[in-house]
């Protein structure tokens, strides 16, 4: 019988002792496995996973390893379960947990910082100094499900209560898996960027973060919101999510198009989500003097950046890691 010291369960949500899971073998290899259902400890709950999204970072981990770090090294052949964009139902409460109730639908953030380092105390838990280290003890240190600890490619997972977001009944399971993806864009534009309603935003790259960045920018009152990309079907979705203008960079010069659409002076913000090698140099030419460029993606190779242009035009360039 599934149980643990001080753990609360309900007969309405029976929990097995073992579950099906995917584990990472060699690079590029996921294998089915049976694992014990984890038991929540203090400040944790057990989530029955109802839906999972697949992020491009999951594929990076599966095929290359980083940014996952298991036991201080590569994640291969360590019985590690990836996956970090998931939602589900709370089915067990760890000792003393009363912030959530059994049966409640939640979506999850990735990171539960160590809570002790300088960055965590500042609220920047995705920049936790103990990422992947955990002081040698996962109970004391940083957790990043799907990165430093088991993730969501399984039937059940334990999450710290600080990583949970309650979701309304009107939101579908599939939509809920993308809440934290939207949070990544929001973190870059508001918490770090300071976006004010009426300011102009360009989003480059209509992947999941980029498309949700369009929706977030529009909801926050940005005007206009311009989306650039290479695929008309993705640009069409961007229109549906609120983009005032879309630019297919295969058909026209992105910088020229953005400046034309914004009266020639450049925009206030660029949210760079493409990871293209030339993206930074294009972005710094899309923004107005004193504008801000937020990097939510990056190329795999080193790139040359026009630093003199950044300095002469007082452009702010910053990166974001995850949702907070």
Q: Which residues does each PLM region occupy?
A:
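NAD(P)H dinucleotide-binding glycine-rich loop of Rossmann-like/cofactor-binding domains
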Residues: 37, 73-75, 99, 114-204
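Glycine-rich beta-strand-centered segment in the early N-terminal region that forms part
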Residues: 38-52, 67-121, 126, 168-170
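Mid-domain Rossmann-like dinucleotide-binding core that forms the NAD(H)/NADP(H) cofactor-binding site
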Residues: 105, 162-164, 168-252, 256
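Residues in the short beta-alpha loop(s) of Rossmann-like NAD(P)-binding domains
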Residues: 230-231, 299, 323
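Active-site capping/gating segments
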Residues: 318-324
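Short N-terminal strand-loop motif that marks the start
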Residues: 1-87, 151, 155, 159
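Glycine-rich cofactor phosphate-binding loops and adjacent beta1-alpha1 units
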Residues: 193-197, 220, 236-316
């Amino acid at each position: 019988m599934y149980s643990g010291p001080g753990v609360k369960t309900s007969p309405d949500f029976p929990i097995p002792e073992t579950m099906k899971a995917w584990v990472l073998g060699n690079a590029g290899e996921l294998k089915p496995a049976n694992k014990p259902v984890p038991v929540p400890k203090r400040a944790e709950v057990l989530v029955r996973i109802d839906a999972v999204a697949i992020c491009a970072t999951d594929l990076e981990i599966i095929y290359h390893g980083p940014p996952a770090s298991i036991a201080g090294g590569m994640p291969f052949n360590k019985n590690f379960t990836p996956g970090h964009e998931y939602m589900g139902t709370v089915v067990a409460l760890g000792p003393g947990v009363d912030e959530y109730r059994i049966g409640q639908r939640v979506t999850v953030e990735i990171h539960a910082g160590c809570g002790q380092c300088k960055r965590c105390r500042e609220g920047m838990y995705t920049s936790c100094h103990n990422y992947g280290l955990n002081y040698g003890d996962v109970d004391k240190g940083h957790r990043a499900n799907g990165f430093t600890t088991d993730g969501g490619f399984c039937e059940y997972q334990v999450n710290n209560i600080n990583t949970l977001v309650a979701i309304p009944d009107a939101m579908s399971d599939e939509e809920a898996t993308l809440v934290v993806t939207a949070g990544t864009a929001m973190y870059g534009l508001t918490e770090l960027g300071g976006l004010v309603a009426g300011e102009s935003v360009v989003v480059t790259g209509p992947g999941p973060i980029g498309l949700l960045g369009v929706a977030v920018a529009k909801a926050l009152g940005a005007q206009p919101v311009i989306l650039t990309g290479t695929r008309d079907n993705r640009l069409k979705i961007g229109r549906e999510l609120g983009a005032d203008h879309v630019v297919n960079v295969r058909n026209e010069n992105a910088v020229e198009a953005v400046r034309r659409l914004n009266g020639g002076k450049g925009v206030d913000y660029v949210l760079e989500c493409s990871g293209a090698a030339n993206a930074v140099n294009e972005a710094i030419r899309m923004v107005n003097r004193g504008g801000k460029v937020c990097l939510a993606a990056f190329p795999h190779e080193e790139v040359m950046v026009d630093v003199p242009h950044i300095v002469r035009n007082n452009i702010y360039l910053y990166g974001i890691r995850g949702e907070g």
